[in-house]
Design a protein with these regions (language model features):
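P-loop (Walker A) phosphate-binding loop of NTP-binding proteins
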Residues: 10-12
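ATP-dependent small-molecule kinase phosphotransfer cores
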Residues: 38-97, 104-107
């Protein structure tokens, strides 16, 4: 059995990444969402084990000490991390896994897993990003400004480190672009070695 592929998706806060990721998981078979660990509080109807594993700071820092994360980062005073064992369990079963992580976490994963496929979701403009952050009504004006400043100074230029860039101007088009990337990566000959060889054998080859 071929190992699964690791897909990374990153974006500035408010670019629509989480909505696209949820849609892609429902749309593409054998694609598993990596449930990250975080020390932040749940928002709205978020549930532990579904959107995130919500843990306190002490638990998270103990996991860091025990090297249980393939990546982790501190974003706006909260920790986020991807557990090593969860990722390995999925890819060893031949399934693809999708990591919804920030640019710092993505850089860590690329160093440890050089064959990952990375996708950067870009908002169509600064003004659109600002409006989206305001409309979702999750943050106060001060926090929104911090997120915009972080996006402008740190995150937006990170697109250069990614394999693919999707501009989320139209949700349906952005979703189809993400789906196309996953399906195209699955057609790479390196992912299909066993299946190709079994077909060749039917032609009398070895």
């Amino acid at each position: 059995m071929e190992r699964g592929k690791v897909f990374i998706v990153s974006a500035p806060s408010g670019a629509g990444k989480s909505t696209l990721v949820k849609g892609l998981i429902q749309l593409v078979s054998n694609l598993v969402f990596s449930v990250s660990y975080t020390t932040r509080q749940p928002r709205g109807q978020e549930l532990t084990g579904r959107e995130y594993h919500f843990v306190d700071r002490m638990v998270f820092e103990k996991m860091i000490e025990e090297d249980k994360f393939v990546e982790y980062a501190k974003v706006f005073d909260h920790y986020y991390g991807t557990a090593r064992v969860s990722l390995e369990d999925v890819v060893e079963k031949g399934k693809d896994i999708l990591l919804d992580i920030d640019t710092a976490g993505a850089a860590q994963v690329r160093k440890k897993l050089p064959d990952v496929v990375s996708i950067f979701i870009m908002p169509p403009s600064y003004e659109v990003l600002r409006k989206r952050l305001e409309l979702r009504k999750q943050d106060n004006p001060e926090t929104i400004q911090k997120r915009l400043q972080w996006a402008a100074e740190k995150e937006i230029y990170q697109y250069e480190n990614y394999d693919y860039v999707i501009i989320n101007d139209d949700f349906s088009q952005a979703m189809e672009s993400m789906r196309s990337i996953v399906l195209a990566e699955r057609c790479r000959k390196g992912r299909m070695t066993h299946r190709i060889q079994s077909i060749i054998k039917t032609f009398g080859g070895t």
